[in-house]
Amino acid sequence: MDALVAGAGVGAVKFCPSCGSPRVERVVPSGDTLVRDVCAACGAIHYQNPKVVVGCLPEWEDRVLLCRRAIEPRRGLWTLPAGFLENNETLATGALRETLEEAGANVTLGDLYAVISLPQISQVYMLFRARLLDQRFGPGPESLEVRLFAESEVPWESLAFRTIARTLRNYFLDRRLAAYRLHVSSIGRRTPITPDLLAAG
């Protein structure tokens, strides 16, 4: 699941996961500087941390593989295969799993290519370059369609998320320069989606 919006609202804990008490308060614990969910019954502090989204930018010759979303948010729009990292997974394992689940594609992972922070919704995208092993791919349950696109064919106006547009713009620019590098940036509510070489991110 590519989840730019899913899980965006980080809400208060209603019941303490440690003791089950409903007496959970939003306070700054002693020795801390941020408001946390703290159980008034047992004293347990419940930390809420950013979610990690992992995925791939699958390549085949001069084309990239995109999936058209079958689920909300942004149903019917195009994205790279990506979703939430699961517990006990490495970044690489999660990226391979998401690519197989969403695109039915087997890939060989290359280098980590994009790290994009989305602080307003407490998410971090981590996307790898990847090489398709063959041209066998197809939509999984979360995709309507899976296709290879040349740069001139990318449906820029129909991309689901700014993270994906940023990553693809950087990728095609790097390809023209014949110099791929790790892109580390952030996207806020008003951040443009131009390549991070050209715009502050």
Model-derived segments and spans:
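Short connector loops at helix/strand junctions that flank enzyme active sites
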Residues: 34, 49-53, 59-61, 73-75, ...
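Active-site donor-binding loop signature of nucleotide-sugar glycosyltransferases
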Residues: 41, 69, 82, 130, ...
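A broadly conserved sequence feature marking short terminus-proximal activation segments
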Residues: 1-16, 170-175, 185-196, 200-201
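Conserved hydrophobic/aromatic beta-strand scaffold that supports enzyme active sites
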Residues: 15, 36, 57, 66, ...
